[in-house]
Amino acid sequence: MDQRLNEQFLGEEKYQVGSKIRGDEGFGIESSEEEKVSRLVWNLINKGDCFLKLIDHPKILPLIQHMIGERVCLCSMGAHMNGSGNERMALHQDQWPLVPHPMKFPFMANVMYLISDNSPENGGTRLIPGSHNWPLIDYKTANSEDIQKKAVSLTAPKGTAIIWEGRLWHGNGLNRSGAIRSNISTAFLQPWVKPQENHQYSIRDEVLSKITEKQKHILGFSPYGTLGGHDGSSVSPANFDPKRESIGILKP
């Protein structure tokens, strides 16, 4: 998996189709040096069969379901490639921007698979234990010096899977190791929330043929209650056809 990810990363860099993100992007926290960015490899579902098992990993999925409920939807699957000299990402919550008020329960959970060893030296993700129970605070307050001191840098070997719920404050650290640190993030939602990646639109045809019916459920190819039907009716993942035409104008 690490070899396939590195190949994909280098290929996207070569053809300049990869994504970049500033450490402060979207959070209202100003930074000074434009070049300090993280590279992202989005939508890994299309980029190697080895990534498909992360949709419903048998050891991980039950933990996600324990946290946010039996029915889950994959929000996104992508890799963070943090080079030496990257900008430290602002502390943030994955769940809070989706709703305008604090929630007493998580509807989102994140799994981070460590493709590299993680340590404070190479910018291991910073987490604030217990912050999922905090009252709502804004991003500038959360990134004040007093709050930053509460963050703990992740230290764990490659191959580890780290799981946290969507209300926990976290963010990438500063990489000063001289090497790239890579992690794969798979985020899950309760299925009433719109995912980050539109899987029905973005999954390539040759990949769709390899995905199991269980995985299609998790990718949102089936309705949730009365949500997500086609022409008002439910469609099972087995019968899902993105090219199926909807009923148009008719006359007697």
Where are these regions (language model features)?
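Catalytic core of non-heme Fe(II) oxygenases with the double-stranded beta-helix
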Residues: 62-63, 88-155, 193-203
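A short, structural micro-pattern
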Residues: 73, 105-107, 178-180
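A structural signal for short, well-ordered beta-strand segments and their strand-loop junctions
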Residues: 73-76, 126-127, 163-164
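A structural signal for short, well-ordered beta-strand segments
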Residues: 76-79, 111-113, 184-188
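Short, well-ordered beta-to-alpha junction loops that form the rim of enzyme active sites
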Residues: 77-79, 130, 166-168
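Non-catalytic surface loops within mature trypsin-like serine protease
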Residues: 83, 115-117, 188-190
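Conserved double-stranded beta-helix
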Residues: 134-139, 143-163, 167-168, 173-252
